[in-house]
């Protein structure tokens, strides 16, 4: 029920320059690069050319109608209308809208989707090409959504079950605890009566006419906006808009009904406590409520910037405060968020180590009082102004992708907020950052603390106990602490510094240059290999990896859990002799992390930095290799979290433990850990395990990939990587052999009225490079055929997921099909699933479906190459598989590899009956 304030999110974001008037009451200037206007029928449009990524176009249709716009007998109908938009229109009956878009390479749920919240319904189309045909089809579909959705009784009846399964799937303790919080925070408002998922009794019985009534009342062009961002000709797009979306609607001659979005402010202290099965971590939330203010003026922009600085400094102090063990606090933070459309909530949120609420409340009140009385220091403000000034300079030249811009615009458009240009935002930040004073921060904090509407909300583990205080006592304690003189805040004068490292500089020589991928291979003087690739897909970012063979399946089974625990505790302690808090202090402006990674078959270290900080990251890497101390604090935290984990094991976890035991007998997995063993590990055991298995194996292959020049990489590699002693160990990888039980496994007792069905698929197979893509295509085919039967035909599920995979060293294909449903329909839907799999084996893959999925796979692959994270992963994976970049280009032969005969043969193997294992978790009463 919350969404972060759009203006807060937009500060320093990217979305080009005009003069700014200095009067604080002047309105913010709208980005001149965005073509925006209104068609004759009232439809607003926002069109922006952005060439990152090339050829892509992102379209968003925003309807200013959500669950808050429903009548009492329509609860859930805004969401049902959203579903019906994909079930038929005058031009595209039944599912033909999806079919038409998918023929152009778009994929349902990935490129074609929608969502409904309290205030809006949003439809999304992601086009992988900007050609005229796709744009015209997209506008044709949008016109159908705007004007011509049909509500045939049979179609509405078919979708009722789908919505019920969506409702069923989301049921959980976390949902219930969230609903309990919202009922308290939003008390007295329409919001608590209008959950977007709706009332299932209404969904089951409402007439098709009443569903259509909502559509005809609220889906009117003067209540909509369309957003188009991408590699486009804006004039052409606006012309297409006018040609395709200008249909008049007589209802626009009537006045739109006003909706009450108000959450009444309860201008006094409130105290409440909630609990829920499965919630085991106690917490305290202290909230202050106020009405929203005007956000489109220069004054409001400056105030939001002041608020951002205040929030940041509060959180920096909270980070220091939470480390004081007598506070009983595991984590603490402060943030501001929208509560509904017209209310702001400022929250101090604390997760506790124990249930000594009274003591922690007093400590929190004293913390707040000390800042209220003494304020922040000039050092704190100057440091933050310096950080934001540097960030402002960097953001001026950073490109933002079209997808992010389009999605950010949804919030701005829905809330009628001004969108600033890059240059205007830069100039405003530059001006206002030089003006902000300590008095501004103090005024802002005092205004929040003086708000009368306060709520202290405590979340207790079960069994819930009566609180040893009432609201009157809490108010008295607050007032007393605010008046009591507090201790001066200790700024912690000790300044941490990176240790000075001295070691011999090594050398490197270039062994290969792969022109096709612009990939360099170097041999370091210690024998290790370095792979370098320049990419600015994420500007100002570099990925570093040091990887070697090994992993959890190369060590004795008895040490599996010991090593996992050792990695966790060592990383939580810090980096070598530097504590985690010291690392955070040194790199507070530009955070750096070097983390241990360990998989089944490989291990090493990973980190991400800005180009200018790569030397610091490599320094941390060298420190990490030097020693692996374990602090008392990190060990105690590990033990506390272990106890909490075993305390809160729910039926879902027990189910996964049982399934894992059946499929991996006599093999240690993440589900076989035992509390006594996990808590028995001491410092020496953990340190020795990390030293032996991690630090004594340093025959790495290094990867440096990102926005950094070759010469800089070579210098850093010679200094920091080439002189590392290459330690080797002889280890033998032991692949896990998956067992397929002959009988289905059923566990009863789920507290939700739901069944979770998982069908595992296993087959012996020799790994081949190209199978990654073939697995994806087969999984998509299986998933679509199941969706058409289980969802579209029999309305038994909301969604189904399927996947197949095989690791390089694994002797088997592993796959999974999963869905949730009404417990009464488990047998029926499982039978239908097996029917679909049997039919694929018997009759093979439909060639039209294969062509469609092949086109979708090509689209997905192109998108992967737009992401630096994906590029780094693809390069590393290729070298891991065959010690060269050849596997990167397998996709170029996909049309020849993914033939009907090949996919049919793969399906025959992967879907065979003898490799299927059905596991079901369902409600106790079924």
From Swiss-Prot:
Top-level class of the enzyme under EC nomenclature: hydrolase
Domain of life: Bacteria
UniProt-listed Gene3D superfamilies: Metalloenzyme, LuxS/M16 peptidase-like
Positions contributing to Zn(2+) binding: 79, 83, 159
Annotated active site: 82 (proton acceptor)
InterPro entries: Metalloenz_LuxS/M16, Pept_M16_N, Pept_M16_Zn_BS, Peptidase_M16, Peptidase_M16_C
Pfam families: Peptidase_M16, Peptidase_M16_C
Reported cofactor(s): Zn(2+)
Entry note: cofactor: Binds 1 zinc ion per subunit.
PANTHER family in alphabetical order: NARDILYSIN, PROTEIN YHJJ
UniProt family annotation: Belongs to the peptidase M16 family.
Protein name: Probable zinc protease PqqL
Name of the encoding gene: pqqL
């Amino acid at each position: 029920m919350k969404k972060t304030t759009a203006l807060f999110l937009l500060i320093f974001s990217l979305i080009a320059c005009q003069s700014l008037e200095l009067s604080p009451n002047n309105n913010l200037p709208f980005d001149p690069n965005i073509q925006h206007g209104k068609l004759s029928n009232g439809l607003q449009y926002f069109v922006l050319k952005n060439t990152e990524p090339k050829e892509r176009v992102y379209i968003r249709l925003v309807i200013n109608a959500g669950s808050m716009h429903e009548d009492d007998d329509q609860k859930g109908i805004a969401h049902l209308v959203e579903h019906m938009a994909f079930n038929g229109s005058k031009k595209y009956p039944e599912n033909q809208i999806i079919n038409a878009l998918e023929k152009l390479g778009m994929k349902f749920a990935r490129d074609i989707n929608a969502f409904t919240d309290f205030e809006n319904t949003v439809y999304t189309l992601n086009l992988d090409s900007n050609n005229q045909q796709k744009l015209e089809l997209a506008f044709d579909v949008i016109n159908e959504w705007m004007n011509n959705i049909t509500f045939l009784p049979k179609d509405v009846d078919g979708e009722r079950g789908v919505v019920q399964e969506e409702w069923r799937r989301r049921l959980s303790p976390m949902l219930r605890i969230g609903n309990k919080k919202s009922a308290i925070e939003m008390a007295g408002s329409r919001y608590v009566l209008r959950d977007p998922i709706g009332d299932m009794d209404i969904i089951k019985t409402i007439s098709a006419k009443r569903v259509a009534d909502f559509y005809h009342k609220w889906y009117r062009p003067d209540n909509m906006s369309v957003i188009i961002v991408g590699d486009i000709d804006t004039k052409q797009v606006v012309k297409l808009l006018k040609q395709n979306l200008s249909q008049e609607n007589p209802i626009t001659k009537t006045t739109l009904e006003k909706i009450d979005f108000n959450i009444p402010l309860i201008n006094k202290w409130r105290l409440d406590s909630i609990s829920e099965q499965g919630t085991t971590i106690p917490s305290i939330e202290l909230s202050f409520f106020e009405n929203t203010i005007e956000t489109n003026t220069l004054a409001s922009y400056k105030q939001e910037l002041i608020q951002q600085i205040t929030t940041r400094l509060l959180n920096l102090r909270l980070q220091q405060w939470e480390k004081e063990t007598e506070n009983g606090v595991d984590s603490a933070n402060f943030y501001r968020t929208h509560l509904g459309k017209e209310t702001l909530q400022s929250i101090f949120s604390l997760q506790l180590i124990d249930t000594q609420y009274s003591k922690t409340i007093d400590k929190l009140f004293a913390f707040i009082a000390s800042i209220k009385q003494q304020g922040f220091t000039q050092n704190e403000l100057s440091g933050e102004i310096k950080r934001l000034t540097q960030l402002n300079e960097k953001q001026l030249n950073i490109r933002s992708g079209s997808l992010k811009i389009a999605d950010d615009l949804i919030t701005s458009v829905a809330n009628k907020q001004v969108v600033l240009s890059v240059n205007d935002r830069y100039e405003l930040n530059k001006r206002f950052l030089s003006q902000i004073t300590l008095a501004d921060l103090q005024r802002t904090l005092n205004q929040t603390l003086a708000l009368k509407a306060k709520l202290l909300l405590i979340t207790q583990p079960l069994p819930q106990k009566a609180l040893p205080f009432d609201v009157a006592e809490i108010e008295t304690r607050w007032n007393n602490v605010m008046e009591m003189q507090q201790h001066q805040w200790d700024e912690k004068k000790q300044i941490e510094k990176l240790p000075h490292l001295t070691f011999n500089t090594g050398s490197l020589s270039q062994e290969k240059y792969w022109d096709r991928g612009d990939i360099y291979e170097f041999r370091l003087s210690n024998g290790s290999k370095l792979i370098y690739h320049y990419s600015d897909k994420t500007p100002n970012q570099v990925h570093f990896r040091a990887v070697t063979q090994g992993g959890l399946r190369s060590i004795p089974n008895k040490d599996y859990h010991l090593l996992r625990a050792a990695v966790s505790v060592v990383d939580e302690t810090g980096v070598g002799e530097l504590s985690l808090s010291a690392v955070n202090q040194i790199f507070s402006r530009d955070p750096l992390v070097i983390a241990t990674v360990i998989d089944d078959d490989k291990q090493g270290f990973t980190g991400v930095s800005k180009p200018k900080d790569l030397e610091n990251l490599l320094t941390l890497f060298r420190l990490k290799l030097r020693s692996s101390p374990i602090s008392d604090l990190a060990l105690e935290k590990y033990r506390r979290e272990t106890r909490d984990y075993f305390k809160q094991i729910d039926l879902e976890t027990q189910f996964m433990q049982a399934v894992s035991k059946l499929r991996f007998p006599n093999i240690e997995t993440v589900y076989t850990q035992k509390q006594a063993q996990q808590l028995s590990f001491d410092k020496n055991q953990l340190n020795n395990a990390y030293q032996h298995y991690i630090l004594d194996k340093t025959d790495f292959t290094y990867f440096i990939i990102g926005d950094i020049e070759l010469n800089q990489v070579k210098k850093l590699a010679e200094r920091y990587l080439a002189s590392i002693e290459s330690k080797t160990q002889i280890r033998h990888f032991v692949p896990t052999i998956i067992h397929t039980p002959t009988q289905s496994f059923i566990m009863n007792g789920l507290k939700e009225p739901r069944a979770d069905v998982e069908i595992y698929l296993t087959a012996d197979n020799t790994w081949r490079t190209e199978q990654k893509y073939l697995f994806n295509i087969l999984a998509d085919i299986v998933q679509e055929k199941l969706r058409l039967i289980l969802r579209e035909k029999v309305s038994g599920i909301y969604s189904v997921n399927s996947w197949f995979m095989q690791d390089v060293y694994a002797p088997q294909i592993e796959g999974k099909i999963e869905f949730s449903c009404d417990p009464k329909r488990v047998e029926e839907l499982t039978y239908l699933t097996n029917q679909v799999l049997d039919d694929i084996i018997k009759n093979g893959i439909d060639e039209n479906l294969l062509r469609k999925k092949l086109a979708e796979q090509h689209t997905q692959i192109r998108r992967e190459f737009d992401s630096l994270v994906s590029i780094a992963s693809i390069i590393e994976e290729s070298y891991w598989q065959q010690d060269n970049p050849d596997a990167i280009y397998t996709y170029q032969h996909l049309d020849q590899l993914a033939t009907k005969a090949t996919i049919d043969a793969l399906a025959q193997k992967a879907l065979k009956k003898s490799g299927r294992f059905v596991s079901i978790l369902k409600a106790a009463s079924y």
